[in-house]
Amino acid sequence: MESIKNQLIPLLKKNWTLKGKSKIKLLLEILLPLISIGILFGILYLSMIITRDFKERPASGFAFDIAHTKQLLIGSNGGLNSDQRNILDNLKLQVSIQHPEFSNDYINRCFVEFKDIESMDEYFHDPFNYRGVMGGVWFPDDSFNGNTIKYSIRVDSDFTHDNTQQFQDREDSQIYLRHYFTQIQTGVDQAILLTNQIAIPIFATGQRFPNPYISFWEKWTDGRKLILLNTGGVFITASLFATLFTLITNIVIEKETKILEGMKTMGLNSFAYYISNSIISLITLLSSTLLVSIILSASQLVHHVKWITLILILIPYSITLLLIAFILCKFFTKSKYAGLMAFLIVLLLSGIGIIIGRFNISPTLKLLSCLFSPIAISVANYVWCYKDLIVFKEVDINVNMVNEYEIIGMLVFDIFLYILILWYLDNVITGEYGIPKKWYFFLTKNYWRKNKKSNINNNGVFDVEATSCNRNSSYNEKNFEKIEHQLERPTISIRNLRKEFKTGDGNRIAVNDLSIDMYKNRIHSFLGPNGSGKSTTLSMLTGMIEPTSGDALINGFDIRNNIDEIRKHLGVCPQSDIIWEQLTVMEHLEFYAALKGFTNSNQRKVEATKIALEVGLGEKLNAPAGTLSGGQKRKLCLAIAFIGPNSDIILIDEPTSGLDASNRRLIWDFILKYRENKTIILVSHYLEECDILSNTISIIANGELKCNGSSLFLKNRFGVGYLLTISKEHNSINNSNLTKTISDIIFNHIPKGSLLSDAGTELCFRLPNESIGNFSNLFKELDDRKKQLSIENYGISITTLEEVFLKIISNSETNPNFNQSVLNTALKTNSSGIKSYQQLKGLLIKRVKTSRKDIKSFVLSILIPILILAGGLILYKNMRTIDIYNTVTQPLILDFNVYGKSVTPVSIDKVNETMTSLFDNSIGHSDRTTLVPYDELHDYLIHHYFGVPGALYFDFRYFKNVKFLHYNVFFNKDYLHALPIYINFVDSEILRSVTGKRIQTTSLPFEHIQSPLEVASLDVNFVAIVFFIILTLASFSLIAASHAGNISHERSTRVKRLLYISGLRKSIYWLSNLIWDYLQTFILVIFLTIVIIAVDDKFRTHFDLYISGVVLFTFSIIPLSYLMSFKFSSHGKAVGAIFAIHFGVGLIFTVISFILRVWAIKENSISFQFLTDIIEYCFYAISPFFCFSKILAIVTKFPGVSRVDQSFIDYWSFHFGLLPNAILFLHCIVWITWILLIDYSSEIKGKFTISKLFSNSPIPDSNEDSDVSNERIIVKQLLDNNTNGGSGNVYPIIFNNLYKKFNSVGNYKSKIAVYNSTLAIPTGQTFGLLGLNGCGKSTTLGMISGEISPTGGKIKLNGYDLIKNRNDALTSIGYCFQFDALIGLLSAREQLELYCRIKGVDESKIKDTVNAFIQMMDLESISNSNTSGYSGGNKRKVSLSIACIGSPSILLLDEISCGVDACVKRFMWNVLMELKKNKAIILTTHSIAECQAVCDKLTIMKDGKLQALGSNQHIKDKFGSGYSIEVKFKKEYLENGVELFLQSFPSASLIDNQHALSASFELPNPPNNPIKLSSIFSNIEQSLKFILDDYSVSQTSIEQIFIKLTKNSITNIDN
């Protein structure tokens, strides 16, 4: 627990810092929950403020309404009889009394008589009549038989309620007030009373029951029932889980980039990791939770469930969501779709919870379903809504309801269950890296007791010695140094360790039964060719990959069962950088210091500062890691490995890869300083590095241990004397006769000598020990004939480690093949000319193969959209149709008995004798009424809201001095027909009290006359259409976003850039992607088309409109997504963001359009429709998703696309199908054109370049080197004479006054990367760029390749101006980036085939060319495996091969030998010597030996400026000061070796800090008294041989000159 506590604080600080670095993401995490819950409350608030009308409204007014251009239809079978006509006359009388100004003719025209009901129906439905008809009255044949007067009121069926229904909770009786029903009813009733001599003017009004939802919480009832009950759980889940979207993406990215496993290898406790992420996430998550609970409770949306109960539900639910996020992360290895998929899964579960909450299943089953917490929250949402609604009987009683406390219990149980699941999955699912435990691990004793394996003795070591285990086919006991038994026990013991990988060619053995021991205070180096198993061994020791067999002990713990204990003591610097680009150097070091044992914050800060200074990052402490150069990142990773008091086992893989000579020596000193009390395993390809640093060296080839021992042991075992290295002048490289002459001279003096290698300018000879007496004579002759033999210099040393390595590897199968015929096939197969169709073929093959290999992503990108679309189709065909108007014409007698035996409260205002008598004789006579005092009526109705259909209030009112009997009908909203029934009841009772007769009123609706909107809605399920359109937009948004993610990935990994530089036409790149992505998208289109045509005849009928729309839509959304991808560098983030934009914009535009269009139709407003058209034009122009949704709506006849002035007939008219299709076509053109304009921007700018647009390059320094100044003169003459171009191009590369300044961004200051460089490089020359990290080498190559735009200056390639004729200038260039731009899902063979087609190699030659490169680079064994699994060195081989394909005239090689072994490096030198015969090559390197071996001319750069320029010898002559003597002392002379050496060479001086046993001296060579090499060798052999293990003598080396010239560089601030 102590370790968890110690790690928790730094993890929290790291996570919080990372969260705080991205202000936008943090803001979104806070805003997204608010937006989600805000949308819910916006909808709910609208439902609350759109309240019912509670005002008193007139139910009378017949005479007033009919007089305003309205007609009343009246009739009876055979015509009106006398009684019926009396009623008609009294109706006319009412009009004439109300409007005495109207003539009788006018009044008569207001009434239309009919003799049969069919004629009345026909008249009503005539389009020319129905707008002027207020309704009709029909008298049945028995209308005046007996004591009942019968008549029927006829209005449009949509102006009444469904006569077959008596109750409903969404409508009320106000519809009868608004559409003249009650006006006709009261008018006819008044006429009947007059006919029966009852001359009481009656005025009726209607009013909804007083709102029973008095309290604020009650006002939410409608929204609570319609919205919160059905969608609340999903909204709450969405609002809370949105906070975790970033967490999921970041965790999966940490897995993907090996950062997570890197932390684990250095002791990270998984529990601490999850706890720290939980705490940081819970800060925002719980804030959102508290906010949601406060909103729900404070708004009183949730009322009967207390706030504390809400908190007790939402907090554990938030925790379960967090745990679900962690669990889902275990199943994602790529960040592409992780966040989005997790979000959809959780929302889906929450949606299922809505169904379960409402479903009448047993409480036990409901609680069991709550094991999925998103289901639980939806069930809880149902419970708290239910509690608030049951008060008003708004929901039916559910006997299977669970209570909120049971749900709280389940959520708490879920927390513990999910923790258990996470613990289990964390052990058995490790992803790509890490060792998974067996599924039954928790049942084993080893897991709980941490037992050692049986072959380990009590001292924590293996019983079997390592040497007895190494018994492979190539085993030779003499090659293994015996370990002194007095040494302490080994800290690392490896026994029979083996690892096999499955590849395209079957199983490949990476490590073959390795057995070895390592000890404290010692550095153990692994040497071997690329892919020999070195990094794989380290990965097994750190637990990143599982051994196939064998075991290893580290500090007594075995790696199979106790890896967690081992990791507490590890410091690891892997081959790839495991850093967060947002964190600073100091933040990295402080974090890992805390992770590895420093508990005091001040101590961490001091240690971090100290170690940063020692690795040369002192002034970068506060710089984000993303701004560091490649070499600086390696320094940071090395510092991370060493920091911490518990790091006593250090594993470092290529620590100085990419570092210049000066910084490399700095790192050597650092490693030696920190070696004490540590066991260090070093993997490196710098043999000098291993020689200087290592106590023990193991050489591995083909996964087998070939030898093991100290450097001296290996040299004595494999060396047979001295190594003579002769550097020839560059003009004699291909002179085989010269090589023979030099060899003859040497063999004449040393008959037993042998030629070891002839690579580039370098000749290496083996001179046996017994011939040492002949050395002086040999050196004397070489000195005398130095010019004649074209020898620049020579040196001699005792057997070097490099020689040992080359000798051992030369006997293995890993040696690259310099077969001349193979070389010619590979390097001299020229491009036959770039062909568009060939490039297109290559790119399409690439997409097919990457999709096939990443089948999970491919299936998900297709399957998920298909599933979403399938859901839309299911809803479209199966969702219940909702009628938007009432079609029921069945008659309904408006009788009080419709609502049973309910008692009606009656109130009388101003009680007097007349009113009392009227009440007693009429309504009061009924046993269905009860008298309630007026001042108590309001409260009575509120408290008796349920179960009372209506109430009555009576008083007398005056209008124009006429006294009226007024009664107000209070109607309950749930009783659909209450208002006309109560009017009938009152009027009938008044008639009965006087005549004994009753009135029977019947509602007999006309068949509904459909409006244009309703005509458009015939047989249309508009709710189903809305869901179908939404889910269709979602599916296409997702697939379009997934395609954009691929583009972002290729751009961020620079694959796209390399393709362009290799000659790919940009239009072909986009065409290939469009073709493949269109094909993939059309899988979705075909699925949609087949299904929708099969199930819906509308799509069959209008197939032309649908198919044109979906095809144009597909053609438009892909390029739009490509365009949007330019703003993203991460695949996962691109997919998530682009999906949200596509779907969100399309959905919002569609909803707005539908609302506006429906409003225009309902209001029959041409002007509003015009405004809607303008808005839609804008939507069309912005979003193709809106265009397609409109087409779907048109085909499905959605009412929201109808028009006021146009019949919905012509599907291809302008405003219907034509316009969106035309706009979609324009979208295709616009987005593709926009992409090409962006991509071709450099070419376009070049065509219209104005020289003034370029900044003037800075004026060269006054003290500029004379050779650099002379080069400016030469280049100016070349440019003035236009010496370039044509097939005979002499200078393929010319750049003049080249200048690049990076402007300041944010906190980063502006920087001049290249000051003012001028060079001309002819064909046949290899030009070397040397310089410190960050001096401008890679920037120079970037400008030459066109990747970086220069700030000023001019570049000419192959005779063409790069700015003005970009395409021609870049026609024949090969580029090898500093960081491999390889497609991880393709093998070496597949990538080479791709670039052969890109560069125009003839199809018939591709196979042979690719085979030649694979054979030449020794890649046969892995040629069919994906390059993502290659070692760094093998990746460099592939990258160099790509650059060389097609025999380009210009090669730009950036650190080509970085990370490759010595054998391959020498092979590359030979390749370069062969290549340069007809090419101009620029090589950047940190290997001085490489520069000397292959470069005809070189420059040393410092702070963007050229400091020296010329051949190797010229620079040595100009800046050197004599001879350089490098020595390695015997151990016993470590203290006084320098002093003894200076005694023998008094004029010498120590020119570099001593590194362990190695030292470098400078010996002046004055021109007036020159010293011969032979005399130096003689002096060493006679006076110093006894104190030296090794030495070499040469002219002052380029490396020493390099260190001298770059000593005060601002890019080398720490030196």
Swiss-Prot record:
Gene3D superfamilies, per database record: P-loop containing nucleotide triphosphate hydrolases
Q: Which residues form the ABC transmembrane type-2 domain?
A: 182-383
Which amino acids does the record list as binding ATP 1? 528-535
Q: Which GO terms describe its biological process?
A: lipid transport; sorocarp morphogenesis
- CDD domains in the record: ABC_subfamily_A
The entry's keywords: ATP-binding, Membrane, Nucleotide-binding, Repeat, Transmembrane, Transmembrane helix, Transport
Q: Which family does it belong to?
A: Belongs to the ABC transporter superfamily. ABCA family.
Q: Under which name does UniProt file this protein?
A: ABC transporter A family member 4
What is the taxonomic lineage of the source species? Eukaryota, Amoebozoa, Evosea, Eumycetozoa, Dictyostelia
